[in-house]
């Protein structure tokens, strides 16, 4: 794709990539994607799909509302859409997966796992919704009884997320090691490890945990512990890649992560 600066090459790539997860690879926000003085945009795709054949997709995007159509039929659940049209972007911002905060790594691996497992996407969505509801109760300093129902649901989704993350990261770690060795000159295998903030044996254990955290969380006004605080660590022989990896190693690993993501999509989604 050739063109002068400011002609819209990146915008075109951004529009292509948007279909994957209904978000841009450069920002989590929707508002910066609108043309000046507008509050919505539409995207139309015609795709030769491996399983669906020739497919037309229409996206109508507003700041707080999205309409998705596949061959003219509305998509009722986002979980049914994520993963249908996977796109793997490769861009300079990928270095933040290595160098950035835990939220950068959670975002990358959440989207990777959600794209190949609708149940993961649904557990993630419901976990964050329930966290918001519990946080509202904490700010309102509600009675203990009001928390019980929310914490029961929160425990169920927390246990599901941690279980699925363990399984998924185990698969990605093996793929990552093979991919990195294939193009790296240092001939070592990186290790991807999942570091859960809470690693408990059952849903009941999570219920007890959130109940025990309630007093502390009331003081803070938010839910301080749980899978939304998880992290992932990539290590080389010298130690953690974030702390000890050279600039070249970090760049190589960021590329390898995207290649591993593509390989996982190919394996799980049969594309």
Residue ranges of predicted features:
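Conserved NTPase motor "head" modules and their coupling/switch loops across ABC/AAA+ ATPases, GTPases
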Residues: 1-4, 18, 145-271
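Nucleotide-state sensing region of NTPase/ATPase domains
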Residues: 17-104, 110-116, 120, 170-181, ...
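Conserved lysine of the Walker
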Residues: 9
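Short, flexible helix-adjacent loops and helix caps
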Residues: 24, 139-143, 267
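Alpha-helix boundary/capping detector
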Residues: 38-45, 134-139, 160, 206, ...
């Amino acid at each position: 794709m050739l063109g002068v600066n400011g002609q819209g090459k990146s915008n075109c790539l951004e529009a292509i990539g948007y279909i994957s997860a209904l978000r841009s690879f450069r920002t989590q926000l929707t508002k910066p994607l609108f043309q000046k003085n507008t509050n919505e945009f539409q995207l139309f795709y015609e795709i030769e799909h491996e399983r669906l054949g020739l497919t037309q997709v229409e996206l109508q995007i507003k700041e707080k509302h999205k309409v998705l159509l596949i061959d003219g039929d509305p998509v009722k659940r986002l979980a049914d859409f994520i993963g249908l049209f996977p796109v793997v972007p490769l861009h300079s911002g990928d270095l933040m997966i290595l160098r950035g905060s835990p939220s950068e790594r959670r975002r990358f691996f959440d989207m990777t796992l959600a794209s190949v497992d609708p149940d993961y996407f649904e557990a993630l969505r419901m976990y964050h919704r329930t966290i918001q509801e519990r946080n509202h109760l904490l700010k309102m300093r509600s009675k203990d009884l009001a928390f019980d129902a929310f914490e029961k649901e929160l425990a169920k989704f927390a246990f599901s997320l941690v279980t699925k993350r363990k399984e998924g990261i185990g698969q990605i770690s093996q793929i990552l090691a093979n991919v990195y060795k294939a193009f790296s000159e240092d001939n070592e295998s990186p290790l991807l490890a999942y570091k859960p903030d809470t690693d408990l044996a059952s849903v009941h254990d999570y219920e007890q945990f959130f109940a025990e955290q309630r007093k502390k969380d009331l003081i803070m006004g938010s839910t301080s512990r749980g899978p939304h605080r998880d992290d992932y660590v990539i290590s080389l022989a010298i130690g953690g890649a974030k702390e000890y990896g050279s600039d070249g190693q970090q760049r190589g690993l960021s590329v390898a992560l995207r290649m591993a993501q593509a390989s996982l999509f190919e394996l799980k989604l049969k594309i």
